[in-house]
Amino acid sequence: MAISDEPESVATALNHSSLRRRPSATSTAGLFNSPETTTDSSGDDLAKDSGSDDSINSDDAAVNSQQQNEKQDTDFSVLKFAYRPSVPAHRKVKESPLSSDTIFRQSHAGLFNLCIVVLVAVNSRLIIENLMKYGWLIKSGFWFSSKSLRDWPLFMCCLSLVVFPFAAFIVEKLAQRKCIPEPVVVVLHIIITSTSLFYPVLVILRCDSAFVSGVTLMLFSCVVWLKLVSYAHTNYDMRALTKLVEKGEALLDTLNMDYPYNVSFKSLAYFLVAPTLCYQPSYPRTPYIRKGWLFRQLVKLIIFTGVMGFIIEQYINPIVQNSQHPLKGNLLYATERVLKLSVPNLYVWLCMFYCFFHLWLNILAELLRFGDREFYKDWWNAKTVEDYWRMWNMPVHKWMIRHLYFPCLRHGLPKAAALLIAFLVSALFHELCIAVPCHIFKLWAFGGIMFQVPLVLITNYLQNKFRNSMVGNMIFWFIFSILGQPMCVLLYYHDLMNRKGKLD
């Protein structure tokens, strides 16, 4: 008899025994004497059986009890031979589930659930301890205060930014009709895009506005600038391809053009509100709007926005206010403040990412029936810093690839130079969005982004040397959540407080 890899289970043995077992005399007699098969019963018995439900129920119970007793007897008899002491218990070479060779092939769903339970328990205790020690720190003016009314110039500036897309549309319409030459079109677009970016900067610098209002305006103006550049660059490329087709230098089928060159105000208006930074005359659309799903996302957005406000007011503000400048004073105390700030800062950043990239952009896409909703990838699994920047913000990444990185390569620049230019542009915009609302130009954000370039080289080297290694992922999480962002928060906060102290 061949020995199988696993001992035969009791259930399998029971099934096999039931197939081999012959019917007993009792069961045979019961089968032929049952009321359903008996044909020579007297009419009185039939009348008696049909007239008495209690008698029928008692007979059925007796039959069921007899069958159960037979099954139990059979089970006990099979158990004697199902797993004998002589059956081999060890049949082949096996590794422990947590050994280095098999740990990544095992499912760790239970440990993941344990981490979730521990995380909830620990954070619940910290919240209760914080409330018992400091009380409720959230002020009534957190969401809105009378000081917000002084930011009306920023609000008017935000509304006036729609003028620049309209000006770009007029330029493109004139270029389509060949009323102005191509060099003039390029110069006009440079003027329009530059003005759309520096006009809000001047408004913020001239007004003593709140930090949140300034950041909101700068982010909005940067989005408008990126959209205008994409609009101008895409139409420029489509005009060039159309000229090649008209001259007969290229065939339309070989140019990979999914749509004809057409300047439409409707397509521009849709592009301005769509959750994308890359212009094209048409986009993939969904058939309808899911109203129930949309309502659930709105509820989630409100809840997580409240969670962010709670963490900022209850945790981050007290930690920052009781800290010192990280580059001055006691190094050990500064390190403790950075580490203490890292956890709530990470929670806020994750909530912000979830609220904006998942909830808000999906809500906007659902309202506009925008089909391509790959706004991010699994950046949390990034093994290198380069992978993180390529996956965490897909709208910006697609814009960089389409309008900056590949154009640099087409002009003969090496990949390293194109990558450096991409990080340089990103660093400039990070500095604008933070330094301008703070009225501080210390280049902390610029330096933090440019510091990613050597990290890209280091993590790429480690990934090539240690295949399938998570060393790069650990370095990314440490730099991102433990060192980088908390350090920037403390640097800008103390520089901002020093500036306000000098003004007072």
Curated annotation (Swiss-Prot):
Q: Pfam families this protein is in?
A: MBOAT (PF03062)
Q: Which GO terms describe its molecular function?
A: diacylglycerol O-acyltransferase activity
- Membrane association type: Multi-pass membrane protein
As its record notes, the protein acts as a catalyst of: an acyl-CoA + a 1,2-diacyl-sn-glycerol = a triacyl-sn-glycerol + CoA
Q: What class of enzyme is it?
A: transferase
Protein's name in the database = Diacylglycerol O-acyltransferase 1B
Q: Where is this region: Disordered?
A: 1-72
According to its UniProt record, the EC number is: 2.3.1.20
Q: In which pathway does it act?
A: Glycerolipid metabolism; triacylglycerol biosynthesis
Matching entries from InterPro entries are given as: Diacylglycerol_acylTrfase1, MBOAT_fam, Oat_ACAT_DAG_ARE
Q: Which family does it belong to?
A: Belongs to the membrane-bound acyltransferase family. Sterol o-acyltransferase subfamily.
Which GO biological-process labels does this protein carry? glycerol metabolic process; triglyceride biosynthetic process
Q: Which gene codes for it?
A: DGAT1B
